[in-house]
């Protein structure tokens, strides 16, 4: 799927309808008494979190959003209809920021949350409201109030069961394509993944959401490579799957490099559950794989397993393993 994790939009709630200056039309009675109704309230704009959304891409081309205007009041004390509300749907994990893109307004963490981002304007008052003992034929009425309008930023922090991390070209996209319905771009060079890819793996009648995070390089927490804009997507994943190319000349250094970047961004990332996966075992002999696994597993707090995305049995085993981690 196309992915967009940050977008600026303009929202304008509906203006309130104007009050009516109407008078009853009665024979031989001047003005006939006021009967002007109030204006309707302007439509309000809501943000609502939806589980079936994974990206903000819909807002890339539609950046201006307006709710309906309240209808003007009319004679016979008729109040105008309220303007139509507007509900903007966003993925779970979306954060709402003010125009400075720094001040957090709201954070969607659960399905079905609603947040009023712009209130509709109040309807104006009809002239009936101003009738008194000293003024039985008031011509006064008020106009509807303008609806609130803002420029806001929407930022998405992916909420997935499993975040796949590793150096560029570790095989993350191939793994995601093998075990889920995702179709990430795959090639044998660094930074094939330029945006987080999302997929859902089904196993034993259960589903696991996985996020393929763009490859980390040294200095990523300072913006090197694809930078910290993607590290934020790891924060809300329940489990980290650390993918390492088993043919790498220095597995230990490769592992530490990624862990250092995670820790430099946030120490909390190092506290997450982690499973280490040595990938591309099909490139080595079976005995060599066993020896590497034995040596690399020493002094590791996390479980270490092997994987070949070309073998169906290997894919099934990793699905079952991931399910046990997130259940």
UniProtKB/Swiss-Prot annotation:
The UniProt record lists the Obg domain at 1-159
One GO molecular function term? GTPase activity
Entry GO terms, CC:
cytoplasm
Explain the purpose of this protein: An essential GTPase which binds GTP, GDP and possibly (p)ppGpp with moderate affinity, with high nucleotide exchange rates and a fairly low GTP hydrolysis rate. Plays a role in control of the cell cycle, stress response, ribosome biogenesis and in those bacteria that undergo differentiation, in morphogenesis control.
Per UniProt, what is one Pfam family of this protein?
MMR_HSR1
Required co-factor(s) are: Mg(2+)
The record's similarity note reads: Belongs to the TRAFAC class OBG-HflX-like GTPase superfamily. OBG GTPase family.
Give the taxonomic lineage as stored in the record: Bacteria, Pseudomonadati, Pseudomonadota, Alphaproteobacteria, Candidatus Pelagibacterales
Q: Which HAMAP family match?
A: GTPase_Obg
Q: Which UniProt keywords apply?
A: Cytoplasm, GTP-binding, Hydrolase, Magnesium, Metal-binding, Nucleotide-binding
Q: Does the keyword Cytoplasm apply?
A: yes
**Subcellular localization(s) per the UniProt record:** Cytoplasm
Summarize the subunit comment.
Answer: Monomer.
Q: Which residues form the signal peptide?
A: none
Q: Which NCBIfam families match?
A: Obg_CgtA, PRK12297.1, PRK12299.1
- Residue sites binding GTP per the record: 166-173, 191-195, 212-215, 279-282, 308-310
Query: Is the Nucleotidyltransferase keyword given for this protein?
Result: no
Q: What is this protein called?
A: GTPase Obg
Which positions bind Mg(2+)? Answer: 173, 193
Q: What is its EC number?
A: 3.6.5.-
What highest taxon heads this organism's lineage?
Answer: Bacteria
* Broad class of the protein's primary localization: cytoplasm
Q: Which residues form the OBG-type G domain?
A: 160-327
GO term, biological process aspect, one: ribosome biogenesis
């Amino acid at each position: 799927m196309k992915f967009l994790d940050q977008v600026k939009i303009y929202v304008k709630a509906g203006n309130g309808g104007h009050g009516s200056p109407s008078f009853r039309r009665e024979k031989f009675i001047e003005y006939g008494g006021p009967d002007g109704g109030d204006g309707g309230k302007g439509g309000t704009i809501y943000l609502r979190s939806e589980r079936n959304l994974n990206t903000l891409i819909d807002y890339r081309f539609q950046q201006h959003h307006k709710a309906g205007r309240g209808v003007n009041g009319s004679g016979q004390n008729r109040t105008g209809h309220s303007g139509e509300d507007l509900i903007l749907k966003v993925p779970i994990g979306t954060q709402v920021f003010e125009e400075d893109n720094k001040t957090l307004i709201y954070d969607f963490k659960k399905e079905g949350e609603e947040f009023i981002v712009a209130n509709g304007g109040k309807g104006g008052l009809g002239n009936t409201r101003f009738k008194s003992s000293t003024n039985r034929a008031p011509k006064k009425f008020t106009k509807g109030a303008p609806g609130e309008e803002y420029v806001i930023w929407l930022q998405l922090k992916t909420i997935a069961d499993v975040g796949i991390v590793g150096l560029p070209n570790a095989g993350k996209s191939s793994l995601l394509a093998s075990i889920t319905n995702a179709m990430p771009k795959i090639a044998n060079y660094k930074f094939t993944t330029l945006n987080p890819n999302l997929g859902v793996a089904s196993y034993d009648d259960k589903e696991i959401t996985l996020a393929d995070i763009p490859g980390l390089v040294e200095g990523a927490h300072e913006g090197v490579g694809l930078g910290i804009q993607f590290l934020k997507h790891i924060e809300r994943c329940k489990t980290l799957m650390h993918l390492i190319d088993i043919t790498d000349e220095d597995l230990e250094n490769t592992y530490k490099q990624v862990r250092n970047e995670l820790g430099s961004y946030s120490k909390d990332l190092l506290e997450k559950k982690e499973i280490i996966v040595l990938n591309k075992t099909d490139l080595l002999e079976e005995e060599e794989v066993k020896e590497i696994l034995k040596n690399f597993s020493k002094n590791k707090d996390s479980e270490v397993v092997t994987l070949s995305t070309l073998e169906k049995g290997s894919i099934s085993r990793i699905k079952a393993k991931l399910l046990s981690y997130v259940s």
